[in-house]
Amino acid sequence: MNPKNLKKEVNRCGYNFSLKKTLQYLLMIFLGIILFSVLLKVKWQYILAIIAMVTVLYPSVILMIFRNMYEEKKFEDVTAYMEQILYSFKRRGKILIALEDARTLFFDEEKEKQGDLHEAIGRAIEHIQTGVAKGNIYQEAFAIIEEEYGCKRLYKVHDYLIQVETSGGECNEAIDILLTDRKLWMERTYALLREKKNIKTKITIGIGFSFLIIYLAVLMIPADFGITDLFISQIVTTGVIMCNILIWFLG
């Protein structure tokens, strides 16, 4: 992936891409690879092969990091939106007012800019206020938000609010159930994210130990044996380093 495409993809996730910082991090990784490889007595032609592989993988790793951050931010936004609109509707009983209350939650005062969800809610409010619709005006308004943030629980919340808005009736108990369901969903999702991070940490520690074992093995071999200079030794050591990098990347 060339830098322009990488920058474009990162910007789509709502983050600023700095080519200078990205290259600085890549240079630090190269220095780390060279240091480890020299300690393991890997020859330069094999070190260059490792560096080439890392160079190919690096843009995908960067993009994966930003996409994960983007998905986590989207999850935080949609759960905050669900909570706010449910509480507002429970208190005021009107979808339009509940949307207006929810929109204020997503304005970044420090950066003085609107978030993506703030903009989507604004367009939904505008659609309701115009009063022009091909079908159910609330369904069409909520569809604007669901286009980017849609998920089963959000659909359920929106469908219920439309039902109460159009048919009336007592909604406090049902909204409490939806709020509880949202809370449990958040707890399960954050538990999964913590577990994923723990697995990544364990993989990193395991890779570190594997490098330590190889290094100790190299130290224990007398230099006059010349084993580390053998072609098969260089290939195996290089293969182990590459496999560990791939395992970390896929983990």
Task: Write out the residue ranges for each language-model feature.
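Alpha-helical transmembrane anchor segments
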Residues: 1, 20, 29-49, 53-58, ...
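Membrane-anchoring/interfacial helices and their immediately flanking loops
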Residues: 1, 129-169, 173, 205-236, ...
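Hydrophobic alpha-helical segments characteristic of transmembrane helices
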Residues: 1-10, 85-102, 152-191
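N-terminal transmembrane hairpin
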Residues: 1-81, 88
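Alpha-helical transmembrane segments of integral membrane proteins, especially early/N-terminal helices
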Residues: 44-48, 116-130, 165-169, 201-202
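Juxtamembrane/interface alpha-helical elements of multi-pass membrane proteins
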Residues: 52-140, 145
